[in-house]
Regions:
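Positively charged, solvent-exposed patches that mediate nucleic-acid binding
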Residues: 1-141
Length: 141
């Protein structure tokens, strides 16, 4: 791995905008992949700076959202653990998507990871599934 890669997870990489989240889940252009216990919902969007205020505020090529439903884990401690595992796995392997998007100028990805299982998994298993999903997404771009 080149030394120039930064394995950080900054605020700009988080999907926080209600408008973009609605576009991802309600809009009909998103795609979904599953690798149990995770499901990835993603949407490839154009970055158009001429739109002004209506343009998505994307300073990074990928924005992610992590969701662990209360239906699966009643205790917040367990939900937070799973979210932390997913964020860490993304942070360590985000170059899979970033390298692919550097080839396609003007494109951005909105990505949501949704937990599907009622059981906790170890970090290595979660990282393997996140990596698998990101590789499959990069192949479909």
């Amino acid at each position: 791995m080149p030394a120039s890669r930064r394995f950080t997870f900054s605020k700009e990489e988080r999907l926080c905008s209600k408008k973009l989240i609605d576009q991802l889940f309600v809009g009909g252009n998103s795609r979904s992949l599953a690798a149990f216990p995770l499901r990835a919902v993603y949407q490839l969007i154009d970055r158009n700076p001429e739109l002004g205020d209506n343009a998505p505020d994307l300073t990074t090529p990928v924005k992610i959202l992590v969701s662990v439903p209360k239906k699966h884990f009643k205790r917040a401690v367990k939900r937070n653990r799973v979210k932390r595992q997913i964020r860490e796995a993304y942070r360590k392997n985000k170059y899979i998507l970033w390298d692919k998007l550097s080839e396609t100028a003007g494109k951005e990805i909105l990505l949501a990871f949704v937990w599907l299982d009622d059981e906790l998994h170890d970090s290595a298993a979660v990282e393997a599934k996140v990596c698998n999903l990101m590789q499959r997404i990069s192949e479909r771009l």
